[in-house]
């Protein structure tokens, strides 16, 4: 959710990085540039997850057109060297401990709440 809501404008609209379709962030998905099953190192990194419409994320990536467009978007946004480094390092292991996950989750929740307030969709916080 963080990838979608942080990319949204103040009205909650976001653009698919593959096809350019605009929709509300709740109707989009977080598409992984390097698929989750291919890299434990990049699976939870923000640079690897960006808004995609369901068509591109679920079907387009399988047929090549969305993945090609995603690659071009990544190179334009981060630069070719960064993207090449991502691809070269996708086999690296990522060892996270329970505390790492807890800290990451806390950070993600805080940042999501910030963006919900920005968009005007603030939900009450829960303890825990």
What are these regions (language model features)?
Residues 1-5, 33-39:
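Short Cys/His-rich Zn2+-coordinating modules
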Residues 85-128:
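Short flanking/linker segments adjacent to small metal-binding domains or redox-active Cys/His motifs
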């Amino acid at each position: 959710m963080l990838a979608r809501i942080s990319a949204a404008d103040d009205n909650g609209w976001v653009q698919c990085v593959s096809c350019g379709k605009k929709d509300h962030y709740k109707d989009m998905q977080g598409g992984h540039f390097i698929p989750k099953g291919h890299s434990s190192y990049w699976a939870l990194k923000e640079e690897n997850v960006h808004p995609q419409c369901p068509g591109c994320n679920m079907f387009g990536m399988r047929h090549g057109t969305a993945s090609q467009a995603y690659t071009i978007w990544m190179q334009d946004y981060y630069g070719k060297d960064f993207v090449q480094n991502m691809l070269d390092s996708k086999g690296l292991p990522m060892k996270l401990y329970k505390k790492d996950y807890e800290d990451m989750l806390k950070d993600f929740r805080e940042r999501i709440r910030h963006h919900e307030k920005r968009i005007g969709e603030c939900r009450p916080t829960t303890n825990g």
